[in-house]
C-alpha cells in the first residue's frame, strides 16, 4: 500500500472499510439529522401556539363583547319594554271595545275581531252620512267607501264572507237596496197624481148642477 493510498484512506474512512461496517454509521447520521429537524419543528410549533394563545388572551373578541353588552341591555330593559307593551295592548283593546259598544244592535257578549269592528263601524258611519245627506260618495272617495252599505251586525254576523262582500259592495245587498230606493222614488213621484184624482172628482161634483134646481 503506497503513501497516497494511505492518505486517501485517512481522508475518507468509509472507503477502506467493508460496506457492512459503513452503512450503520450512515444510518446513525441520518437519524441524528431527522431528530434535530423534528426538534426544531416542534419548538417552532410550540412557540407559535403559545404566541396565539397569548394574543387571544390579551386581545378580546369584539363580537363577544358586543353580544354581551346587547344581552345586558336587553336584560335591563326587558321589564320596562314588557310593561310598555302590556299597557299599549290594554289601551288598544279598550278602544276597540268602546268602538264595538257604540255599534247598534250588537250584543255586549258578541265576540268580534278588530277587523270586524272596523268594517262594521265604517259601514255604519257611511250609512249615517248618507242618511243625513251631508256628503254623498263621489269620485274622490276611495272605492271601498263608495260601495259601502249599512250592514246590520245581527243579519250579517257570523257570515264573515258576506259581511266583507257587502262592505265592499260586491254582494246582492247593493242591488236590492238600489232597486228598493228606485221603487220608492217612483212611488213618491206618482203619489201626488194618484192622490189628486179624488180631489178632482169632488170639484166636478160640486160644479155640476143639482137635479132639484131644474
Swiss-Prot record:
<dbReference type="GO" id="GO:0046983">
    <property type="term" value="F:protein dimerization activity"/>
</dbReference>
<dbReference type="InterPro" id="IPR011598">
    <property type="entry name" value="bHLH_dom"/>
</dbReference>
<dbReference type="GO" id="GO:0005634">
    <property type="term" value="C:nucleus"/>
</dbReference>
<feature type="region of interest" description="Disordered">
    <location>
        <begin position="175"/>
        <end position="214"/>
    </location>
</feature>
<keyword id="KW-0539">Nucleus</keyword>
<feature type="compositionally biased region" description="Polar residues">
    <location>
        <begin position="48"/>
        <end position="59"/>
    </location>
</feature>
<feature type="compositionally biased region" description="Polar residues">
    <location>
        <begin position="203"/>
        <end position="214"/>
    </location>
</feature>
<dbReference type="InterPro" id="IPR050283">
    <property type="entry name" value="E-box_TF_Regulators"/>
</dbReference>
<comment type="subunit">
    <text>Forms inactive heterodimeric complexes with TCF3.</text>
</comment>
<dbReference type="GO" id="GO:0007517">
    <property type="term" value="P:muscle organ development"/>
</dbReference>
<feature type="region of interest" description="Disordered">
    <location>
        <begin position="1"/>
        <end position="87"/>
    </location>
</feature>
<dbReference type="GO" id="GO:0000977">
    <property type="term" value="F:RNA polymerase II transcription regulatory region sequence-specific DNA binding"/>
</dbReference>
<dbReference type="GO" id="GO:0006357">
    <property type="term" value="P:regulation of transcription by RNA polymerase II"/>
</dbReference>
<feature type="compositionally biased region" description="Basic and acidic residues">
    <location>
        <begin position="73"/>
        <end position="87"/>
    </location>
</feature>
<dbReference type="GO" id="GO:0030154">
    <property type="term" value="P:cell differentiation"/>
</dbReference>
<protein>
    <recommendedName>
        <fullName>Transcription factor 23</fullName>
    </recommendedName>
</protein>
<keyword id="KW-0221">Differentiation</keyword>
<feature type="domain" description="bHLH">
    <location>
        <begin position="76"/>
        <end position="128"/>
    </location>
</feature>
<dbReference type="InterPro" id="IPR036638">
    <property type="entry name" value="HLH_DNA-bd_sf"/>
</dbReference>
<keyword id="KW-0217">Developmental protein</keyword>
<dbReference type="GO" id="GO:0000981">
    <property type="term" value="F:DNA-binding transcription factor activity, RNA polymerase II-specific"/>
</dbReference>
<keyword id="KW-0517">Myogenesis</keyword>
<comment type="function">
    <text>Inhibits E-box-mediated binding and transactivation of bHLH factors. Inhibitory effect is similar to that of ID proteins. Inhibits the formation of TCF3 and MYOD1 homodimers and heterodimers. Lacks DNA binding activity. Seems to play a role in the inhibition of myogenesis.</text>
</comment>
<dbReference type="Pfam" id="PF00010">
    <property type="entry name" value="HLH"/>
</dbReference>
<dbReference type="GO" id="GO:0032502">
    <property type="term" value="P:developmental process"/>
</dbReference>
Amino acid at each position: 500500500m503506497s503513501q497516497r493510498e494511505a492518505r486517501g484512506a485517512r481522508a475518507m474512512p468509509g472507503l477502506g472499510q467493508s460496506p457492512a461496517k459503513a452503512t450503520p454509521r450512515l444510518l446513525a447520521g441520518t437519524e441524528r439529522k431527522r431528530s434535530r429537524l423534528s426538534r426544531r419543528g416542534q419548538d417552532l410549533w410550540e412557540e407559535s401556539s403559545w404566541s396565539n394563545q397569548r394574543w387571544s388572551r390579551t386581545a378580546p373578541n369584539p363580537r363577544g363583547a358586543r353580544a354581551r353588552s346587547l344581552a345586558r341591555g336587553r336584560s335591563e330593559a326587558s321589564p320596562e319594554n314588557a310593561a310598555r307593551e302590556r299597557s299599549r295592548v290594554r289601551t288598544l283593546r279598550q278602544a276597540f271595545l268602546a268602538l264595538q259598544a257604540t255599534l247598534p244592535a250588537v250584543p255586549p257578549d258578541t265576540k268580534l275581531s278588530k277587523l270586524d269592528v272596523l268594517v262594521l263601524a265604517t259601514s255604519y258611519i257611511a250609512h249615517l252620512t248618507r242618511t243625513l245627506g251631508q256628503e254623498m260618495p263621489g269620485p274622490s272617495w276611495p272605492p271601498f267607501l263608495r260601495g259601502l252599505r249599512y250592514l246590520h251586525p245581527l243579519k250579517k254576523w257570523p257570515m264573515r264572507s258576506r259581511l266583507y262582500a257587502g262592505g265592499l259592495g260586491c254582494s246582492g245587498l247593493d242591488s236590492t237596496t238600489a232597486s228598493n230606493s228606485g221603487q220608492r222614488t217612483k212611488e213618491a213621484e206618482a203619489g201626488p197624481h194618484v192622490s189628486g184624482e179624488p180631489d178632482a172628482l169632488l170639484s166636478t161634483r160640486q160644479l155640476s148642477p143639482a137635479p132639484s134646481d131644474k
